[in-house]
């Protein structure tokens, strides 16, 4: 299994990974209310691929997991009492972590997060911030297990879900 940045020719496979996951898990209690074509959008995926910010786990030629890390956050992040404050490019935001549907429950989320944390350390990142939508208890468990600290619960507006409660997590590198 390799950890790497996605390439432009990975776009279709990554988009299909998200769309298949949405189709097959939308009725599950922890589903984060992603919508095909809206979140993650094609433009969002392509932009992050172009910037080497879409990270993947590839095994035997198949992308089994992916996530986005960049410094783009929702405006409400500025109101959170983070232990490490953003001052330029010292903090990454973790977005849209997804595991290919048929490979869920195999520890790939944990493996991907561990690789991201190691990569962040190598890039001299001081902290990783993220938010988890109110009902996504599976993501809460993943991030807590990986060492992220719960910071607060905030009302955040995202176009795809409206204003909802999100739990804010931080990992200090």
Residue ranges and their predicted role:
Residues 51-67:
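Conserved beta-hairpin
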Residues 43-56, 72-76, 93:
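A short helix-loop-beta-strand connector motif used in the catalytic cores of GNAT acetyltransferases and
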Residues 23-43:
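Conserved GNAT-fold acetyl-CoA-binding loop/helix
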Residues 2-16:
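A short beta-loop-alpha structural element at the N-terminal edge
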Residues 113, 120-131:
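Conserved GNAT acetyl-CoA-binding A-motif
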Residues 68-96, 104, 159-160:
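Conserved acyl-donor/pantetheine-binding loop and adjacent beta-alpha core of acyl/acetyltransferases
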Residues 99, 105-118, 141-145:
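Conserved acetyl-CoA-binding loop-helix of GNAT-fold acetyltransferases
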Residues 133-137, 145-146, 156-173:
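C-terminal "cap" of GNAT-fold acetyltransferases
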């Amino acid at each position: 299994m390799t950890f790497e940045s996605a390439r432009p020719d990975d776009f279709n496979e990554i988009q299909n990974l998200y769309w298949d996951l949405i189709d097959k898990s939308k009725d599950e209690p922890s589903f984060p209310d992603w919508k095909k074509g809206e979140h993650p959008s094609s433009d969002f995926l392509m932009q992050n691929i172009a910037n080497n910010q879409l990270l993947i786990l590839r095994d035997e030629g198949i992308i089994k997991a992916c996530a986005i890390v960049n410094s783009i956050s929702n405006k409400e992040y500025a109101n959170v009492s983070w232990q490490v404050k953003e001052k330029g490019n010292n903090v990454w935001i973790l977005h849209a972590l997804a595991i290919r549907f048929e490979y869920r429950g195999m520890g790939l989320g944990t493996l991907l997060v561990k690789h991201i944390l190691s990569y962040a350390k190598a890039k001299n990142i001081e902290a990783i911030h993220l938010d988890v939508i109110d009902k996504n208890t599976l993501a809460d468990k993943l991030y807590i297990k990986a060492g992220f600290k719960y910071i607060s619960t905030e009302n955040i507006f995202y176009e795809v879900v409206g204003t909802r409660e999100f739990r804010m997590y931080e990992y200090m590198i």
